[in-house]
Amino acid sequence: MSKAIGTGVCVWLLATALSAPGGACRAAETRGEGEQKLVRDGVTVALQVQSLAKDGVLREGEFADVRFRITDTTSGQPLAGVAPGAWLDPQAVAADLAQGREHSCKSRVGVFLKSSIGARPLLDLNSYYLMVMNRDASVSVVDPQVSVGGITSTLSRIELKQPPMDWVTPADNKRVFVSMPNADAVAVIDSEQFKLVDSVAAGSNPVRVALQPDERLLWVGNNARAPEQSGVTVIDAQSLKPLKHVATGAGHHEIAFSKDSRQAFVSNRDDGTVSIIDIASLTLSKQLKTGSHPLSIAFSALSQAVYVADGQDGTVTVVDAVSLSVRRVIKLKQGLGPMGFSADGRFGIVLNTLENQASVIDASNDSLIHDVAVSAEPYQVVFTKAYAYIRGLASAKVTMINLASLGEGRTPISQGFEAGPQAPRLAGDLPLASSLAVSRDDNAVFVVNPVDNT
């Protein structure tokens, strides 16, 4: 039975801080139909609630998308530099009558911003959750916006068949695929309900997992001892049916894709090769020699090439994603490991564990432009719009490299912060998954400290 939504929606416009001047707190009514608009101080806020049901009808207990559009009233253009905050809560009739509805709503927003566990709205539209991979056979769900005694609240715990190793999620974050090497399977977690929904057979010793850009297929690296079982298993990401196993070579496998999802590139560490797989037919197209010990592989959308870092040879081999041939070999130093690219594909950062440094490659001309000192034994790197964040195994410090400071003839700007009391190495064996996660606004990262489980 269809039910209209008749609760109040409090909208608070934030400039660069929660206390920014000119903030407007208003209550809006929505009956689940059309678009509601609020116009004030030259700003238009449009609210739309859209059912996710196939028939488009809003029903109690079902999912819906709540969308806000904030525009300049005069020009109709999107308003820059604001961060909307919104809460859904039952209308407080007595408070509205006593204070006036606007002041009543504003006072409640002030309470909600304190993130007290005893004063929460019916629905916090700004909320998000963090999933934390544990070393035992489980995944924890944390609410970072609610704390008890200064410690963030654990919302749920999801039990798995075996300890996890790596994970990946599609853009809509509705599922999480988790590799379990000891179970020869990939766990599928429903991240809307925080429960395990399936375990899919994924070949022998599944470790690395990756979704191709169009998210149609899930690729699983099989670090199997038997040559015929070492390679990748391909799974349909929607039906969860295994489609094919492709033997590629011996050793650990890293996986990258062309931007158009036509080619998959799989490194074979012990064979010193990269296998190129045609995704349409799921057949091996080419096998390239890329050094003695390829440890990482990354794709640049700017140069339309794949970069393969070899730890033993100290080289980065550039493979053209169109011609599928080696375009250049960049000579660096022994000890190379993980590599990644900035979102625009311009700057590639490859970590050197032996030298405690990060080498920066400019993808516009495939050349080395910087060597930057970073945290001891760097082993993980992630990117936001503005920074590269680098985690070291032998240091509690996380290094930040300012991407805007990079370029030929320029001096890189770096800084750091402590992420816990001790270095990650002291925690013992760690999962392959990154301990760094980019925040949803792409302006910060969350850092896990495996030593004290924070």
Locate the predicted segments by residue:
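Bacterial N-terminal signal peptides
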Residues: 8-20
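Predominantly soluble domains enriched in secretory-pathway, periplasmic, or organellar proteins
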Residues: 25-454
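Short helix-onset patch at the extreme N-terminus, typifying the N->h transition
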Residues: 6-9, 384
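N-terminal secretory signal peptides that target proteins for export/translocation
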Residues: 1-4
